[in-house]
Amino acid sequence: MEAIKGSDVNVPDAVFAWLLDGHGGVKPLEDNDVIDSQHPCWLHLNYTHPDSARWLASTPLLPNNVRDALAGESSRPRVSRMGEGTLITLRCINGSTDERPDQLVAMRLYMDERFIVSTRQRKVLALDDVVSDLQEGTGPVDCGGWLVDVCDALTDHASEFIEELHDKIIDLEDNLLDQQIPPRGFLALLRKQLIVMRRYMAPQRDVYARLASERLPWMSDDHRRRMQDIADRLGRGLDEIDACIARTGIMADEIAQVMQESLARRTYTMSLMAMVFLPSTFLTGLFGVNLGGIPGGGWRFGFSLFCILLVVLIGGVTLWLHRSKWL
């Protein structure tokens, strides 16, 4: 493949444009640099910036359909061979489990053995690990190594997110054993996060597996082996997600049962109170509506005797409920 001039790739408002030095480090791309397989270029763009958008729309280095894909709407993870290059769409986790579950950041990239063009709208936090290694001189030395390191960082962030969700589920299960109900909507949000993760990480695992099996010229056997390890690791994370989704379903049933039992206990308590006070209410009502006058109304001990009668009646009903094992 022909070498590329640095001036053809330099974009003024690029997030960064670096030339890999072949020893694990990078240097800023300059116009007089020569880009080839020994010194590939990594161009990282925010496709909403005007200069980046114009470069994507006009550069002859990219096929026409690749230009649209790099600046298009978010899509599910996929990999496509485009002539001498490969178009890859990946998803990564940004932030914590308290954020919206569907806020997965899309990163699109087109690469061959000479240069890498990656685009995003929001910052991809997982790239910070790769950038840090390159700046310290311990990063990838070629395009294949770069892709493996990026996929490894994305999988690390996904695994950490899955582990956080798993810890939350364990805490919920422990609280349910103590009859503690989570706040309204908490379990639904947790379940949605798991489902969204499952939706995007399953095709991403397939992307990794395909990259491990494809005979791409810029990937060595060691790169393919590492990529297969990453696919297997993400596959284990998907198994954990499936288990967590099943556990949230069980917890939802358990929460419904706990709430139903709590309501039943309250209803039972109110029914017992009604049974205890129903006879006394009947007597007070009967005496109160007596049109011929209240019996014992002219006797000074009448009210006291009536109160004693009510206490004895309530005590008798309570004793009967206790012996009947209703209390």
From Swiss-Prot:
Q: What is the first-listed, main subcellular location in coarse terms? A: membrane
TM ranges are 274-294, 301-321
Q: Which InterPro entries match?
A: CorA_cytoplasmic_dom (IPR045861), CorA_TM1_TM2 (IPR045863), MgTranspt_CorA/ZnTranspt_ZntB (IPR002523), Zn_transp_ZntB (IPR023714)
Give the UniProt keywords, A-Z. Cell inner membrane, Cell membrane, Ion transport, Membrane, Transmembrane, Transmembrane helix, Transport, Zinc
Q: Give any GO molecular function from the UniProt entry.
A: magnesium ion binding
Question: In the UniProt record, which is one GO cellular component term?
Answer: plasma membrane
Name under which the protein is recorded: Zinc transport protein ZntB
> What species was this sequence derived from?
Salmonella paratyphi C (strain RKS4594)
Q: Which gene encodes it?
A: zntB
